[in-house]
Regions:
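Extended, charged catalytic domains and RNA/DNA-binding interfaces, predominantly
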Residues: 1-97
């Protein structure tokens, strides 16, 4: 899952993006939002900067189709809620993609 795609330490390259390999992209986490360019970010970005044209809105405008995930950060707290009709790997994965 592309993780904080809009900061300069982990930038998501939409030219190389393939939804077959990464059908989910992180839209929000404790550091801030990657929904659109210049979204509000946590004031302590660990020395990182936000990079334009790497937001999820930018990817959607380019025609990509992907699901969103959001969660906390580090130490196992990055939890995503899923509504699935079947409690199987295929059912859960199908619900988020």
């Amino acid at each position: 899952i592309p993780h904080h795609p809009g900061d300069n330490a982990h930038t998501l390259d939409w030219n190389a993006y393939d939804p077959a390999f990464a059908p989910l992209v992180e839209i929000f986490q404790v550091r801030g939002s990657y929904e659109y360019d210049n979204c509000p970010m946590h004031p302590q970005l660990y020395g990182r900067n936000v990079v334009r044209k790497h937001s999820l809105q930018y990817g959607l405008n380019r025609g990509f189709d992907f699901g969103f995930t959001a969660g906390g950060e580090h130490e196992g707290v990055g939890v995503t809620g899923v509504y699935a009709t079947e409690f199987t790997r295929a059912g859960i994965f199908g619900s988020v993609t």
